[in-house]
Curated annotation (Swiss-Prot):
Gene Ontology terms: biological process: cilium organization
Biased amino acid composition, Acidic residues: 613-638
Protein's recorded name: Protein FAM161A
Family designation: Belongs to the FAM161 family.
Coiled-coil intervals, chain numbering: 243-268, 518-544
Gene Ontology terms: cellular component: centriole; ciliary basal body; cytoplasm; photoreceptor connecting cilium
Gene that this sequence comes from: fam161a
Source organism per UniProt: Xenopus laevis (African clawed frog)
Subcellular location as annotated: Cytoplasm, Cytoskeleton, Cilium basal body; Cell projection, Cilium; Cytoplasm, Cytoskeleton, Microtubule organizing center, Centrosome, Centriole
Described purpose of this protein according to its UniProt entry: Involved in ciliogenesis.
Keywords per UniProt: Cell projection, Cilium, Cilium biogenesis/degradation, Coiled coil, Cytoplasm, Cytoskeleton
Residue segments, region Disordered: 32-55, 143-175, 504-524, 588-647
């Protein structure tokens, strides 16, 4: 389908490819050979003077003219030698032909306007342009160019035909324009003014001149030759005729004025002033003398300064002075210095004896006694923290939590009619709590010293262990030489020092093991409690409403309170009045059962539960919590705490 459509479009197209008439193959004219091309000389030419005896029909002749006209514009590329000069010559030829055709059209148009009686003021300009243009047109072409541009001659007839068609179209337009112009001219026929009459006469004269110029001004073989300017001749004539320009006249006038002014100044008389007497005074000589005196004074002054600062050379005296000083110093140093050799003192005998060990023991004992006495003094002067003192003082006066009934109660409680002001009580309680909170003191650590190493049982055990090691080890047996044998040579003092150092090292006992076990157990329990607290905290966080929900709840509460207050204001009530009445009504409801029974004034009110009692119970709970925390701290006590207790 697409192929059929393409073939139909190609067949119906206006542009058709050239075909060889013999082979019917698509081939352009310049690609064919010379023998295959149709020669115009063989065919019957309407332009040639000689005609054949055969008579050609009219339809064949018209068809031949059409084909001939079409063949004239066919451009044979093989004849062109592809040079720029030939190309530009051909372009110039075409341009000249086009200009010639346009001139013919203009002349025809002007002729029509002249026949219709319309004046065109541009005729003179066009005529002048024709004259100048004719000078620029080329007279003839070279024979070589004529041979190469044979086929371009057929362009002018086609242009002529197109010009005839355009003139026919322009003729219709010109008739319309001429009729409009005639109407405009007839509109001014009623006026009779001499100026217009003169213009009309001038118009008729101009038309006559144009007619004569059209007839006379035809193309002629004349060329305008430029002539040189005659400026020098003109200037010489002006000089002969004494013709001056405006600038020359002005210059002469100015010179005359200046000359007259100078002559007037020269004719004036003047008298010179006498020479002043100061001119005759010898001022210059005085200045020269003054300068010489100043120069002499400066020279003498500078000489005096130089003589004062000048000093003679004293190298020999300086060297002698140095030698004497050096000798004096040497004598002084030899007299003072005495040869003192170092001599070490002998080692005191007390070091090798047992007295030093006893003295060290005594000093250590005195130190321990002093520290013990100091600890007792500090213990007596110390006091409990304020929180524990307050709890102890309060514990003696506080009431018991649980009350046991002792049979029937003999007295009846007195119920007070007055309602306490809970807000003031709460504020007072907060103040008391803040005061007690700020009054806490920090406990200070005190030095301590354990005396477990001084126990006799431990010393005996250590000595027995040392003896067993010395007996059982292989190094102490013969024939081996052991370092322990050399230790027996040392004195008893060094042995006692070694024993003391060994006794001071901590030993693991059963009590310490039990204490460590208890500590580990408590730590495990503490970690479990901590994990439980974390889980409870996470649960609270999960159950806690979101921030948006809390904001919504708070907004709802505020809106409800605002609505409640608005209702109270509308009714003319006060918030305090409502709270008082509500509290009194609640108390009346509780007391309504016992209205008939009156309580005597002398009875006690021990059974009442006022707000103060509730607050006391809260304080008791706090003190119980503090005591539990103290117990936990005791449970987590370390060896250092036990050492402090022993001290």
């Amino acid at each position: 389908m697409a192929q059929a459509h393409r073939e139909s479009v190609l067949a119906a197209a206006c542009v058709r490819t050239p075909v060889n008439p013999y082979t019917k193959a698509p081939l352009t004219l310049y690609e064919r050979e010379l023998g295959d091309r149709p020669h115009p000389s063989a065919s019957v030419s309407p332009r040639g003077p000689a005609r054949t005896s055969m008579e050609v029909p009219a339809d064949l002749e018209s068809r031949f003219c059409k084909t001939r006209r079409c063949q004239d514009w066919v451009f044979d590329i093989s004849d062109i030698h592809h040079s720029e000069k030939d190309y530009y010559v051909q372009v110039e030829k075409l341009k000249n032909a086009h200009l010639h055709n346009m001139e013919q059209l203009e002349k025809m148009y002007d002729r029509k306007l002249h026949l219709n009686g319309v004046h065109n003021p541009e005729n003179e300009k066009r005529v002048a342009e024709d004259v100048y243009r004719s000078a620029w047109e080329p007279k003839s072409l070279l024979p070589a160019q004529h041979d190469h541009l044979k086929q371009s001659r057929s362009v002018s007839p086609s242009l002529a035909e197109s010009s005839h068609e355009s003139t026919d179209e322009d003729y219709g337009d010109s008739e319309h324009s001429v009729s409009a112009r005639n109407k405009i001219l007839h509109m001014w026929n009623e006026f009779t003014v001499e100026d217009y009459v003169r213009d009309s006469e001038y118009f008729s004269q101009e038309i006559a001149k144009n007619k004569t110029s059209k007839k006379s001004k035809e193309w002629s073989h004349k060329i305008t030759i430029p002539e040189p300017f005659q400026m020098t001749v003109r200037e010489s004539k002006k000089r002969e005729m004494n013709i001056k320009s405006k600038s020359e006249i002005e210059l002469e006038n100015n010179l005359l004025k200046e000359k007259l002014e100078e002559e007037a100044e020269c004719q004036k008389k003047f008298r010179a002033n006498p020479v002043p007497s100061s001119v005759y005074l010898p001022l210059y000589q005085e200045i020269v003398e003054r300068n010489e005196e100043r120069r002499r004074f400066v020279k003498e002054k500078s000489k005096e300064i130089l003589l004062a600062t000048q000093k003679p050379f004293q190298f020999i005296e300086r060297e002698e002075r140095k030698k004497t000083l050096r000798l004096d110093l040497m004598q002084f140093s030899t007299s003072e210095t005495s040869t003192s050799h170092f001599k070490a003192k002998p080692v005191p005998k007390s070091i090798y004896g047992t007295s030093i060990v006893e003295r060290l023991k005594e000093e250590e004992l005195y130190r321990g006694i002093r520290t013990h006495m100091r600890a007792q003094e500090l213990l007596q002067s110390s006091s409990y923290p304020t929180s524990t003192l307050a709890s102890g003082a309060h514990s003696g006066t506080k009431k018991g939590r649980c009350y046991k009934l002792k049979g029937k109660q003999e007295h009846k409680p007195k119920i007070s009619d007055t309602i306490p002001h809970f807000q003031t009580i709460h504020e007072n309680q907060q103040k008391r709590l803040l005061e007690s909170k700020s009054a806490k003191h920090v406990t200070l650590c005190e030095p301590f010293q354990l005396r477990t190493s001084n126990i006799t049982s431990h010393k005996e055990k250590i000595e027995m262990d040392i003896q067993a090691d010395e007996e059982n080890l292989k190094e102490t047996r013969w024939p081996y030489k052991s370092p322990r044998a050399s230790a027996q040579i040392h004195s008893a003092g060094t042995m006692n020092l070694r024993l003391e150092t060994l006794s001071q090292t901590p030993r693991s006992t059963e009590s310490s093991k039990r204490r460590e076990y208890a500590i580990r157990k408590r730590e495990k329990q503490r970690t479990k409690d901590y994990m439980k607290e974390l889980e409870a905290m996470e649960q609270r966080v999960l159950n806690k409403p979101l921030l948006i929900e809390r904001v919504a709840q708070r907004n709802a509460l505020l809106s409800a309170e605002k609505q409640y207050l608005n209702v109270l204001h509308e009714l003319g009530l006060c918030e305090e009045f409502v709270t008082k009445n509500g509290q009194s009504s609640s108390v009346d409801e509780h007391v309504g059962v016992r209205e008939e029974k009156k309580i005597p004034q002398g009875e006690s009110t021990e059974g009442t539960l006022a707000l103060e009692d509730l607050l006391d119970d809260e304080e008791d709970d706090k003190y119980d919590c503090e005591s539990e925390e103290a117990e936990e701290e005791d449970a987590y006590s370390t060896d250092e705490d036990h050492r402090i207790e022993e001290i």
